[in-house]
Amino acid sequence: TQEDIQNSGAKTAFDAVSNVPGVTINSFSASGADFGGMDSRTNIRGLDRGALVLVNGIPMNLNGKSGIGAIPTSAIERIEVVKGASSTLYGAEALGGVINIITKTPSKEGGSATVAVGNRGSKRFDLSYGTDRFLFGIDRKYWGAQDPSTPVRYDYTGRKGYDYYTTRNKGNSLGVFMSGKLSDKVTLNYNRAESRSSFGLISTETNPMRQAHHSTTYNYKDDRNNVSLIYKDDNTTGTLFYNDRTMRGESRVHSAKQFKPTDTSYVARQYGMDVQHEWDFRGGKDYLIAGITGKQETYRATQAPVYTRPHRNTYAVYSSYSREINPKWTAILGLRYTAISDPIKDQHVLTPQFQVLHTINKDSSMYLNIGKAYTMPSLSDAFRSVNRQYTAVSGKNLKPEEGWNYELGYKRMNKKDSWKVDVFYMDFKNFFQWQPDANGRPTVRVNGGKFHN
């Protein structure tokens, strides 16, 4: 809840989700900001890239990354976390679960301002203001350079002939959030995130000329935009959404004077829509949710000698039926069919889910959850730079990462406390791994072994 988030001291959504049991975070930069191509990660139940992140029900995952470090807590109403395979209602990438960040909606006039200053060049400025029709928030953060603190990276293969360590230079980030009520049923949301980061790979050689020749500084400009138009009445919800990310990198060998663009620069975009309706039966005891969704993902390498523009189209129909067997027992059955037009190989995926809920008393309940989930490889995974030429490097037999989640749990919630305990088993196959190309670089995405937890 909003009160829990405030009491935790979290500054961003990235900080807030770290307090949820079973959710782990990892960030290479300050305050959860992405560090160039080294993205911050949000994982559920130990599964890397297994969390689907939503904002107001809109998918934030873009090219396999979510990036929630730029959403200030001043813009958040609450955060919902659903653990376990959840592809039936939410689609791809929900192998470990779903994190849904619900932002504040315009309700009343008022605002807040925060100024914070810390060590190592840390500064933060946060401002938010809203009326009954419009809400605006901005969050600006700065961080200074850090002394080398990472361990020396050893040249185990002996190919380079030198070791090196990493440094983090000063940087900053900007988060902007706006929400406006166009009518009582229509809301328009916009979020922009900017990050400016820099780091160095510094040779440990003592010879100044050799050290300069083998040391490199990298600068990154990372911009994201997220727009959603949401219609909601008593039984129907419809959304239109657009996400993009522009990554621009440059590097300079210390023996050279000028920076040069890196071949990891890219532009990724996602367009989509979702419409769902709910029907009630037997006086509200039972209900059926059914919907359709469609989206297109695109990826463009902006600095590669040969430009590539792979894209993926995804269409799905889904439904979930809840049946009250008696006041103590409820069963839920869901099914989703997804058709994927993919540049590597078209896919057709069925993801069922079965749940049983048992109410013990007004505070306690037990549940059983069995569900299937899947995720597709990122477009940038399938198209990599080989000999400075972007090409499709994954084989036509590349399959989605998919599997089952089995879970039995107990939860208790009241005004004084809430707690939950469960036993789960995750069984996934076609786990994504990297395979070396002809030059020994790990650039070829393949299906490897299995994941169990």
Residue ranges of model-derived segments:
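N-terminal periplasmic accessory domains that precede
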Residues: A13-A16, S40-N43, L54, S66-G67, ...
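Extracytoplasmic beta-strand/coil segments of soluble accessory domains associated
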Residues: F14, S18-I58, E77
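Short acidic/polar hinge/loop motifs at secondary-structure boundaries
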Residues: R41, I58-K83
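Extracellular loop and loop/strand-boundary signature of outer-membrane beta-barrel proteins
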Residues: N63-G64, G110-T114, T157-T166, S203-N219, ...
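Short strand-turn segments of transmembrane beta-barrel domains in outer membranes
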Residues: K104-Y129, Y164-K170, K399
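Periplasmic-side early beta-strands and strand-to-turn transitions of outer-membrane beta-barrels
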Residues: A116, S128-Y220, N430
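Outer-membrane beta-barrel signature, preferentially recognizing the C-terminal barrel domain
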Residues: G118-R120, H213-D234, Y266, K345, ...
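Face-selective signature of the C-terminal outer-membrane beta-barrel domain
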Residues: L135-F136, K181-S195, N219-P352, L357-T359, ...
